[in-house]
């Protein structure tokens, strides 16, 4: 180590370029990529005549030179991140990529990891992948292996509000597949105790068919609280997706459990599994009209006007997802015109998608919403040319 100090000292005075090249080469050799990052900024500051005491700080950079130093900062951060990834140190790499808002290289590195990691590494990766949203679905897969379903459900519930809809959907798919596989394996084991020569590979639906005895005496084959949560998560999955039918099978299984094992939800999901069977059948276009009527009846029969918007929200969501936009607009105009634009169902966006700007204008006028009415005018198609 002492040799490098001598080498640096022997570089001719005034040859700063050679000095920094020698320094960088040594830091790369030592795999000291944090100091390599600092050295790149020190070099740029030296070239600009700036103080060198705090090489990585931007606080001592005049505004006129800030853009130049920031460009070097980004390049140096990218270099350090790449080197840390090559060394297999994802958390250290993320320190740099996070600052420059380039998550993809880290997401790609996390994607390449096996689903089972050493316990000493998994927590840091989970923090980055799931809680910081770099690769949530891989985070879910890792957590299922490391901590099991219960902890993963809790983590997903905590993280879901910070995830983009596509990320939330991918995580829900992973949860559905995991629980479906576990439940199918458990039910198959129970059936094989009575039918030793049961052929492998049957679906959960096939295994349950004609075997009501599976549920006798309050019997169950998976943690029922896990089943409840995963079926709820599955509502975020958009068709077409194989996982929707898997979720339907989970709901069908749940509907056969003893009533004491069927935990209710908020209306219209108070009859939890029966309602979810209808919900997933709408998405799968299996008896869609009957399934939609179930939710319409729940809305019509609700005595409390304050509770009707949530029931209408579910029905409008299903109508939109099954491309029935005109009835969705009519229902939304009645119950959801004041809904937050951050919600899944936006009244204004629905009107635009359905080509019903006239309804948007009518509702905003009735509400004395000048801003909304102006937006509707601006969104209106131009009149046909004469």
What are these regions (language model features)?
Residues 1-98, 104-105, 110-386:
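Long, low-complexity, acidic Ser/Pro- and Gly-enriched intrinsically disordered regions
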């Amino acid at each position: 180590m002492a040799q490098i100090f001598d080498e640096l000292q022997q570089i001719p005075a005034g040859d700063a370029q050679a000095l920094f090249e020698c320094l960088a080469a040594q830091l790369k050799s030592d795999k000291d990529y944090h100091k390599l990052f600092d050295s790149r900024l020190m070099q740029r500051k030296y070239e600009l005549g700036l103080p060198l005491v705090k090489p990585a700080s931007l606080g001592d950079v005049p505004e006129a030179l800030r853009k130049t130093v920031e460009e070097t900062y980004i390049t140096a951060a990218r270099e350090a991140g790449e080197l840390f990834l090559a060394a297999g140190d994802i958390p250290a790499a993320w320190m740099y990529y996070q600052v420059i808002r380039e998550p993809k290289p880290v997401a790609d590195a996390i994607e390449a990891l096996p689903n089972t990691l050493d316990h000493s590494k998994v927590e840091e990766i989970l923090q980055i992948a799931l809680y910081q949203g770099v690769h949530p679905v891989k985070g879910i897969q890792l957590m299922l292996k490391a901590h099991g379903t219960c902890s993963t459900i809790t983590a997903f519930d905590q993280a879901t509000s910070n995830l983009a809809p596509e990320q939330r959907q991918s995580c829900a798919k992973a949860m559905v597949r995991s629980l479906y596989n576990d439940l199918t394996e458990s039910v198959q084991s129970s059936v094989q105790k009575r039918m030793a020569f049961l052929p492998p590979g049957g679906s959960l639906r096939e295994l349950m068919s004609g075997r009501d005895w599976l549920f006798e005496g309050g019997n169950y084959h998976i943690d029922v609280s896990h089943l409840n949560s995963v079926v709820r998560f599955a509502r975020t999955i958009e068709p077409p997706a194989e996982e929707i039918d898997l979720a339907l099978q989970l709901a069908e299984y749940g509907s056969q459990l003893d009533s004491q094992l069927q935990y209710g939800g908020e209306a219209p999901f108070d009859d939890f599994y029966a309602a979810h069977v209808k919900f997933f059948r709408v998405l799968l276009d299996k008896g869609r009209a009957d399934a939609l009527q179930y939710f319409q009846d729940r809305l019509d029969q609700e005595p409390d006007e304050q509770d009707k918007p949530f029931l209408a929200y579910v029905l409008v969501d299903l109508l939109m997802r099954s491309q029935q936009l005109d009835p969705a607009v009519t229902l939304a105009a009645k119950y959801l015109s004041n809904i937050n634009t951050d919600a899944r169902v936006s009244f204004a966006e629905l009107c635009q998608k359905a080509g019903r700007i006239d309804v948007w204008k009518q509702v905003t006028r009735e509400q004395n919403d000048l801003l909304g009415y102006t937006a509707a005018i601006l969104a209106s198609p131009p009149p046909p040319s004469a």
